[in-house]
Amino acid sequence: MHLVSKRDDEVTQAIDQCVATGYEAVILSFGSHLNMEDTSTQNSTRWKKLADYAHQKNILLGGYSLFSSRRISDEDDVIDAATGKPGGAFFGNAPCFGSKWGLAYRDKIKQFFAATGFDIWENDGPYPGDRCASRQHPGHSNWDDSQWKQMEIQKELYRWLNERGVYINAPDWYFLDGTHKIAIGYREVNFSLSREQQMILNRQNIHDGTIEKTPSMGWGFVPLTQYQGGGPEAVLEPLREHLPAYRQLMMQYYGAGVQACYRGPRLYDADTTRQMVAAVIAWYKKYRSILNADLLQLRRADGRDWDGWMHVDPSLPWKGFIMLFNPTDTAITRTIRLPLYYTGKKTTAIIKKEQGKAMSYRLARDYTIPFTFTLPAGGYSWYTVE
């Protein structure tokens, strides 16, 4: 859960809602009242108390902090070699990690995690690769070594966090430096679209974002409340009034093995909402091993016909897990050649629709089977391969 909070009691409420639904972590999202750069004893004590409360409930607690894409000062920002002045960064203005402010930022993050016991760091705007022409910054000599030195500063920070078991979310490809999860497809304006459009877009992002990554290497986004723009048709609040859309957005991401940012003040607003969320989480946890397995893209979503994917792992009891969607306004029946090579099945396979009746299939020489499915208008379904 990505919590938008203004008060400490909202954090404890979110932790309690996670316990009630089966969620395992809360991240204080951007726009919340968490400030990791505040090194006061009062701030550390406050957040340690909340982290301790979360840990007593077996919930992980994390928080958001922005490094890049903001202006600090003429002395600490990246200096453009062409002008000798701040500016010219990838995002216009950005701090230099080798500046006094940048080195202090690194130390403040370390101090916060050491003092509070937080489990997750959402490092938005990690170092984007800006070079800096300053000759006064203590962390680098000049333009020539600025990129290398800044990357080393960030890498050392990530290594320090990893040594302490801290999980790192960041939007850039820094896996070899210590990041654990990056965006699977993220454009802020897209989350002002209608819920129906977001469903299709999310499945397109899942398709594209799992070609070079395993599902758990990417995170998606579900705006429970307004984000950037968009009207009531773009958000899920009040949650109890949009249960089918809320459920499908969860099923799509969890069915892909992708953890999304469910961003808002709460996970449920009524007992019916709580029951739905808890049921989806229980479903995900039952099939978690196969849902985190490698994913084969069957057909990319385009809103015109069926789309879907299949997880595969021959070492598991469930060798495959299929998710299929029908975005059209009419029921459809399709027959496709389902590729089962990577399930490890060689002669026959058993497929069950939502753990219902078992159907036996004989594999062709190319390890495919003719698979016929029917989906209702705007519907979806899932199947296991055994």
Feature names for model-found ranges:
Residues 1-8, 29-44, 87-106, 138-150, ...:
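The substrate-binding groove and active-site-proximal loops of carbohydrate-active enzymes
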Residues 362-386:
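C-terminal beta-strand-rich structural cap/linker in extracellular carbohydrate-active enzymes
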Residues 19, 113-114, 254:
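Non-catalytic positions within long, well-ordered alpha-helices that form the structural scaffold/packing
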Residues 7, 45-52, 56, 60-118, ...:
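Active-site-adjacent "subsite" loops/lids of carbohydrate-active enzymes
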Residues 1-77, 260-305, 313-320, 327-334, ...:
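Conserved structural scaffold segments of CAZyme catalytic domains across common CAZy folds
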Residues 24-33, 105, 109-140, 169:
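Short acidic catalytic loops
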Residues 153-358, 372-374:
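Active-site-proximal substrate-binding groove within the catalytic cores of carbohydrate-active enzymes
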Residues 47-59, 146-166:
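Alpha-helix-loop-beta-strand connector modules within alpha/beta enzyme cores
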